[in-house]
């Protein structure tokens, strides 16, 4: 898939819902931060050095000796994309919102299957990312590690024998790794246990963020849980620790769902079928309301209360209902009210042929 096809298509591999534990853990992501030796960190980069970094990355991904490790990678300057297309890459979790700032000096590298993306000149010179469906942190790390090794055949990284990889933010020094899972926790929220679980997570040295990272809301009861510390731990230790905690949260969410269904079956079923009815027939829907309804419906699908609704479709719709993709589909700028009408119509059309 070319970059142009990527921004015209809401689907991405992590949405396939075919990974382990994907009924609750939507996706796993591993990202490493790397900087080039002898070049100032991005917050000090001038235009000349920004272009130097982009040129170095372009050469690295073209290195035929590293082709088996890298796979097919394509680099594009963010300046080549429209504001809508840049935002769609954010909505698909392929780049961060921060990459959009001062975008003329930045670039993105994508693998054809969208499993791998590399942000160039974000907070660090390179941020190499792999995102996979379900709980697949080890597999995502294997992919990132191979790409990192391939790039290092050409690039000279800023590295200290004493502390490890050097990064713009001190919290990333060491392995430079951030591992995270996107997890759906409506059961804990309905059982009023969510705050306690999130507080416990923070005490374990992990951080909890919203759907699109730091400073964003947990739309649709979706949370990103990631490690905070990279110094003094190996990559394997970071991965194994997060897997262990993710499984504990998974078990708590499953228990909350079982208890809710046992004690408040009619209430849960009512939420699920009300959500389905609203999504199938509503004429006006804001993105926030749609995400809330998707959460209730997703809960019903995962608990086998309702059938015939692919989770993959719900994952895709999380991107399709965002303002950027709606504007792109409409082919013109819309007012917020017009977007809400368009969004409701889009969802009705998607639901019209479901065997429900």
Curated annotation (Swiss-Prot):
Transcription regulation in keyword set: no
GO terms under cellular component: extracellular space
Protein's GO biological process: phosphocreatine biosynthetic process
Activity regulation comment: Appears to be allosterically activated by the binding of pArg-containing polypeptides to the pArg-binding pocket localized in the C-terminal domain of McsB.
EC class: transferase
Record gene name: mcsB
Protein name in UniProt: Protein-arginine kinase
Keywords for the protein's UniProt record, in alphabetical order: Allosteric enzyme, ATP-binding, Kinase, Nucleotide-binding, Transferase
PROSITE patterns: PHOSPHAGEN_KINASE (PS00112), PHOSPHAGEN_KINASE_C (PS51510)
Family recorded in the similarity comment: Belongs to the ATP:guanido phosphotransferase family.
Keyword Membrane: no
Gene Ontology molecular-function annotations: ATP binding; creatine kinase activity; protein kinase activity
Catalytic activity field: L-arginyl-[protein] + ATP = N(omega)-phospho-L-arginyl-[protein] + ADP + H(+)
E.C. number: 2.7.14.1
Positions contributing to ATP binding: 27-31, 93, 127, 178-182, 209-214
Function: Catalyzes the specific phosphorylation of arginine residues in proteins.
Protein source organism: Pelotomaculum thermopropionicum (strain DSM 13744 / JCM 10971 / SI)
Superkingdom, natural source: Bacteria
């Amino acid at each position: 898939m070319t970059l142009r096809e990527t921004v015209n298509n809401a689907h991405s591999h992590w949405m396939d819902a075919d990974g382990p534990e994907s009924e609750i853990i939507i996706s796993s992501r591993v990202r490493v931060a790397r900087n080039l030796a002898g070049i100032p960190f991005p917050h000090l980069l001038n235009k000349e050095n920004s272009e130097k970094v982009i040129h170095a990355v372009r050469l690295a991904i073209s290195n035929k000796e590293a082709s088996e490790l890298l796979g097919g990678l394509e680099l594009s300057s963010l300046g080549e994309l429209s504001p809508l297309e840049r935002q769609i890459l954010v909505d698909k979790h392929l780049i961060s919102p921060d990459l959009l700032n001062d975008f003329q000096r930045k670039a993105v590298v994508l693998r054809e299957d969208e499993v791998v993306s590399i942000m160039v000149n974000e907070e660090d010179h390179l941020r190499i990312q792999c995102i996979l469906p379900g709980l697949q942190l080890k597999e995502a790390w294997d992919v990132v590690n191979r790409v990192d090794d391939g790039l290092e055949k050409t690039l000279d990284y800023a590295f200290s024998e004493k502390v490890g990889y050097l990064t713009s933010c001190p919290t990333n020094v060491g392995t430079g790794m951030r591992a995270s899972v996107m997890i759906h926790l409506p059961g804990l929220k309905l059982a009023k246990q969510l705050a306690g679980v999130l507080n416990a997570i923070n005490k374990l040295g992990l951080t909890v963020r919203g759907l699109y990272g730091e400073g964003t809301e947990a739309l649709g009861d979706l949370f990103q849980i990631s490690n905070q510390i990279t110094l003094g731990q190996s990559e394997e230790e970071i991965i194994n620790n997060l897997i262990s905690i993710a499984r504990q949260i998974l078990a708590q969410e499953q228990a909350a769902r079982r208890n809710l269904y046992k004690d408040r079956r009619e209430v849960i079923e009512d939420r699920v079928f009300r959500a389905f009815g609203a999504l199938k027939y509503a004429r006006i829907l804001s993105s926030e309301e749609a995400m809330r309804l998707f959460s209730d419906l997703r809960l019903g699908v995962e608990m086998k209360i309702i059938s015939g609704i692919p989770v993959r479709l719900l994952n895709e719709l999380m991107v399709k209902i965002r303002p950027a993709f709606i504007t792109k589909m409409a082919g013109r700028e819309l007012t917020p009210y017009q977007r809400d009408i368009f969004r409701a119509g889009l969802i009705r059309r998607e639901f019209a042929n479901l065997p429900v």
